[in-house]
Every structure is written in C-alpha cells, then in structure tokens.
C-alpha cells in the first residue's frame, strides 16, 4: 500500500517524486515540523509559490532579536507537499542564524538536511528562500519606521504612517531617506507617487509590501544563482508579469 501511495505523489507536470522528498514529507507529518506561528512575530512574508497547483500561499513568520532569527515557522495549508518540505527544511536551516544572511543559503544546505538531491525540492527551495527574505524585509521595514526610542520589533503592521510622525513633504523626505538608506544594497528607488500615498493614507504593511515588490526580481536572481529554483507555474506567472 505504501509503495502504491508513493507512486502517486508527483510534482508539477507529473514529475515523479523521489525517495528523499517522500521520506521527508512522511516524517514531517509523522513527527511534526516547524509548522504554525511563533509565539512572538516581528516579520512575516508570503508568496503564492504554486499558482498552478493552488490558490493558497506559503507564509513564513520570524522572530528576530539581536540581528538573529530566534524563531521561525511556516504555514502552507493547501500548497503541494514539496513546497511544504522546502519550507520546513529552510526553517530548520535558518533558525538561530543571522538575519542578514538569508540570501546566502545554497541548495547544498537543503540537500544536507534532506539527505540527497531531489529535483522536486530544488524547484521549491527558491520559493521558500524568497518567502523568508520577504519576512526579513518586513522586519527591517518595521525597524526602519520605528521611532528613535525603539519598539520596531513590536510595531503594528496596520499602523498609519502619519501616526508615526510621517506627515507632509518633510515626512515624505524623511521616509524616503530612511528606506533608501536601509535598502541601499538593492539600490532602492521609491516612486514619488508612492511616498505621497503612504504619508496620506498608508500603513506600515503597505510600505513593507511595496519594498518587497520593488526588490523581488533582484532577490530571485540571487536565489537562482545559489542553485535553488521555483515551481514551474511560479516561473510562468513571473514571466507573464514581465
């Protein structure tokens, strides 16, 4: 019965699953993994990683303190099994590491925990890395927008920017300077109209999602360079948006 079940586990396009992916998936549900949500969260990222398989998304939640990922969990209720495996592996790999190093992981880091090479997990590892990077960006935005006395780790994503003191033209200039300095590594350039929208009505979450979107293609190229890929339907959707 087990062999029959394993033979039915496939990836996108009907690609057969391999023993490493199947064993990890079975162990994940038998023993439990890093699913769920940490008790404390100060960064959250999500990606529709498998648009060809599901309308659901993978979420990664982090608790970052002292520039280190202290706790990390994933949720992906309807994603295919291989996205769940990739997400769980990355959470184990990243827990306890510096948050600044989230784009330094390579396929070898996944393979070491998986026990062998799996084409299916290679195709999902990049989506997991992208989701984690978005969670770290979300945390960085919260810190960036916090007041000088701190509190960024607990900043409510729904808080209006005007409640944080960003108002008028001076608020726009101060906001732009903070964000572009924080994300200088990506040569971030924020459209003027966005600055106006944010200061008028925007929230912390609005800023975070826009920054994530502006740097996404750069991040994807870096991830691909690390030997990690994306589900076929994700790549097709990305190409259609180009």
What does each of the following model-derived ranges do?
Residues 2-242:
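Domain-level signature for proteins that mediate thiol-based redox and metal-cofactor handling
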